[in-house]
């Protein structure tokens, strides 16, 4: 299991010496990850989809706003590599735009939610007492809010938000709910770190609170935050697909994988490519992130046997 609250174990492992060869901690983590074939495969799949979402438009001469009246509801062909929709729109162009939207939502929600979790959780643990009690009460109250109801109201234009793009509204709502569970875990781990001698010494010497949090607490829960980032991306993408599928997420003219899957669900028998293509892209996207997450978890694990292989290989190279 990943040791995210014992910095001594991490430090001891990051200095593996054999015949004057010392391997840095970050290098060990990188080697472990790169030796995990499943994780590397996931990384390549995700990068391929990411590049596809940016440059995929060059693979077709059509865009998502152009209708081909001569090819309406047609299967894949040389002119339309992934076929066309019932409206005569090139499916490749829609997939590129939808993949880009889904990845963008995942990255924004995953990144910002991790930052909020780290700041909120560490703040509760550092100050403790009444500050911790009040912040924990607020956290518990937010957790009890019904997410689906909030999403439905926000994306329908409630609260005077009609002028904002539907994908941006969904990002705001997902951010509102995505950080709470991790914040509680960060609080728990940070409270354990607060009992460490080096943290007590820093407080005794009058080191500013902000510096203690960012210098001593956040780095020692880094593995948790990295893993939560990849899980957050996956969770946000799946949430987008689920909410858009049932009609309370992203709405036209914005396009996402969830929108494409939802619109094609009732036409699987007549136009199967309209359903299976975006569904396959979604599985590849979330599956690659899950593979990367498993690889990162193993790479951060101090008990992993790959440290021994790294040590042996480096020692042989030094002879």
Where are these regions (language model features)?
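Transmembrane alpha-helical segments of polytopic membrane transport and secretion proteins
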Residues: 1-44, 292-319
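Transmembrane alpha-helix signature in integral membrane proteins
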Residues: 42-43, 91-126, 285
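Short hydrophobic alpha-helical segments within the ABC transporter permease transmembrane module
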Residues: 94-98, 138, 145, 186, ...
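C-terminal transmembrane helix and the adjacent membrane-cytosol boundary/short C-terminal tail
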Residues: 160-164, 177, 223, 227-231, ...
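Transmembrane alpha-helices
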Residues: 100-116, 210-242, 289
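Generic hydrophobic transmembrane alpha-helix motif, especially the helices
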Residues: 81, 91, 112-119, 125-196
């Amino acid at each position: 299991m990943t040791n995210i609250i014992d910095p001594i174990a991490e430090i001891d492992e990051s200095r593996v010496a054999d015949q004057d060869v010392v391997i840095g901690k970050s290098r060990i983590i990188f080697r472990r990850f790169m030796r995990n074939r499943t994780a590397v495969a996931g990384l390549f799949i995700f990068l391929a989809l990411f590049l596809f979402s940016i440059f995929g438009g060059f693979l077709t001469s059509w865009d998502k706003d152009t209708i081909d009246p001569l090819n309406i509801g047609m299967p894949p062909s040389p002119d339309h590599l992934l076929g066309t929709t019932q409206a005569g729109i090139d499916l490749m162009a829609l997939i590129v735009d939808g993949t880009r939207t889904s990845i963008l939502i995942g990255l924004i929600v995953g990144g910002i939610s991790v930052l909020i979790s780290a700041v909120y959780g560490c703040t509760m643990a550092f100050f403790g007492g009444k500050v911790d009690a009040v912040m924990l009460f607020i956290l518990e109250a937010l957790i009890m809010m019904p997410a689906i109801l909030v999403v439905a109201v926000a994306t329908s234009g409630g609260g005077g938000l009609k002028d904002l793009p539907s994908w941006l509204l969904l990002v705001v709502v997902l951010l509102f709910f995505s950080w709470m569970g991790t914040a509680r875990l960060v609080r728990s781990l940070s409270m354990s770190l607060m009992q460490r001698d080096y943290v007590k010494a820093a407080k005794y010497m009058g080191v500013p609170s902000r510096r203690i949090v960012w210098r001593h607490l956040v780095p020692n829960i880094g593995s948790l935050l990295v893993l939560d980032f990849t899980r957050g991306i996956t969770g946000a993408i799946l949430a987008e697909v689920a909410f858009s599928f049932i009609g309370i997420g992203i709405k036209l003219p914005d396009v996402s994988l969830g929108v494409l899957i939802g619109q094609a669900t009732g036409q699987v028998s007549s136009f199967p490519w309209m359903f299976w293509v975006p569904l396959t892209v979604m599985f590849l996207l979330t599956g690659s992130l899950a593979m990367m997450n498993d690889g990162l978890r193993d790479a951060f694990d101090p008990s992993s046997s790959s440290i021994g292989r790294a040590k042996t290989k480096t020692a042989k190279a030094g002879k």
